[in-house]
Amino acid sequence: MAVTTAQVCEWADYIDQEFVFADFPPGSTVLDIGFGTGEQMRRIGARGCRSVGLEIDPGLARKGRMAGLSVCRAQAERLPFRTASMDGVVCKVVIPYTDEEKAVSEIARVLRPGGTARVSYHGSGYFLRYLLADWDWRRRVYGLRTMLNTFFYALTGSRLSGFLGDTLYQSERRLRRYYAGHGLEIVEARPSAGFAGAPVFIYHVLRRT
């Protein structure tokens, strides 16, 4: 999943600049879920690791191959890798656009015991900022429908139909429940600066038990 320079600038006050996604020991095999432009894969490679990228967008997957990166096109909910085949996983704000528990379970499945995942999510503050502080009515509607979709999902376990249900924000409570159910433990938790008292981003370092 590609992030534009404009998006980085827009959210700069909330991004945890000290959280290093590429922090894995040399020699590790690391999966980057939603590798986007490949920037993170190159950082992982520069640390002496073998990086493998996964991307659902066909154009980004093609560009990654043309750039010489080891990539495949697939969904986060169906990782085409063997169980316990990865030393590390990077997943940078991909989960909000997936079946979140299934994606978390797949991260746990491909990690070897003792392997680590470095993951970030959208918290509720991300969409509250869209809803309450954005001048563009379309983005305010996007914030509102994501908030409503997540409330509905938390109550029923199902999303709203169609485009209304395409995005969820994550909560610490739901994430901790998924982790407990799929053999992951939190090594480090770093909520970002908040908006209206709610975290905009959530950063977790996880270990496979």
Over which residues does each language-model region extend?
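Class I SAM-dependent methyltransferase SAM/SAH-binding core
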Residues: 37-78
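A short acidic, Gly/Pro-enriched loop at the edge of an enzyme's catalytic core
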Residues: 77-89
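A short glycine-rich, Lys/Arg-flanked "PGG" loop and its adjoining helix->strand segment in the class I
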Residues: 101-113
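Short alpha-helix
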Residues: 165-183
